């Protein structure tokens, strides 16, 4: 066999980062990839997925140093002996933090950067720009600075800038992290079309399981090792294995594995297959138990307190003339847990920033605990409303966890004794006691996210706004974060959460407001809104598959557990 028989060959690859003395990031990896294959690599945070990706194009070991052994051969080229600049022609890598990849002053120049550096003639570059803009659906945005694009557009631009180098292999590291459900499908559709049309070899690293169905192969990684490599229809039925390693299993096979004695091979994977299997097995929904769930929901509705936040005819226009909010009317009652949903750029974050006075309406009014925000400031409203940003690193700045959490109470003039009490209380709430002396930036993303929440709790607000609290976290970390949020809500905090993760909305939120183009298009209890599946799709949203399955059976269940509890076998 010559070196170039396979598109990628990885032999006995082990790598340990300099700073990790006691643990290999990847260990004993053996992998072969055929030309034109579409592979999805999945695993929890810290499994070694991104490390493996960076070994494929030579960033490791050429830029990132550490202990490296084994061999990687890409299209017949030994990666360890080849500069990254040469490897970039063979394999393109779209980073997990795609914004870090964008630096040009407009979209066109961003796409041209790679070909220019490879000495491609100007006329050809013009043609490449045209072709790439069409592929990634950014036509008409040639002159827009990347900083003015939405998250989804930036993501597509990062993919386009890599495609412009015309690599034979495209590797994307968690390309859909910040995207709404339809945006995610869009990125996977682009990837699939490229794969089919251009015989491109495609490697996608993902936490999300739903879209992996379309791949040729799925590779599961855990603790730096490959633990499963097979066809999607085989791997995605491994419900127990996926839960064990910290990945979210598909909801449909999980449901049927709990309500039937089906062999793994016979488990349905999609809601369409699920409807058929439900009927085949003669399963039924217990009407009495379903009505009990609805009754408990009605009881909860009656338990909320007074209206504490009120938006009346709110409009907001940014300084560049963009109207971000257009006639918003919304009331939030004490004790509610409301999710703000909508496609990227629909106005969710702009609206949330009005609730703690970070922004003030251009027209209309926002009343928070009886105070008109037009006559208030962040400091005053901050006594009532705390805001955790999407990226915890935009919020964290202190050298120790203790000082980070103590900052708010100290600014409010608390005595050191009271500061100590509040820090202890906040750390207990987020389950991070004992971390007081740690450097926040040395913690994992999930831990930093919890520290950001703790620093808000220390100010003892009544309302907590969470902007994408689970972005970049794996399933186990997401569950842990959301159980914390649920506890905060149950202890009396009102929660306002912005998210794209639909299963989290289904399982944790009470109410939902769906936004598009600065307007609230749908509002109500989560179950009532998720019934309206066609309307949600029009608004770039897609409910979890267990909701889609149950809707087609005449009921709306919000979680696998809920549906299992009402299934008569």
Curated annotation (Swiss-Prot):
Mode of membrane association: Peripheral membrane protein
Per the database record, which ranges form the ABC transporter domain?
A: 8-248, 309-542
Entry superkingdom: Bacteria
Q: Does the keyword Nucleotide-binding apply?
A: yes
Regions that span the bilayer? none
Q: Per its database record, what is this protein's job? A: Probably part of an ABC transporter complex. Responsible for energy coupling to the transport system.
Designated name of the protein: Putative ABC transporter ATP-binding protein TTE1589
Organism encoding this protein: Caldanaerobacter subterraneus subsp. tengcongensis (strain DSM 15242 / JCM 11007 / NBRC 100824 / MB4)
Lineage runs: Bacteria, Bacillati, Bacillota, Clostridia, Thermoanaerobacterales
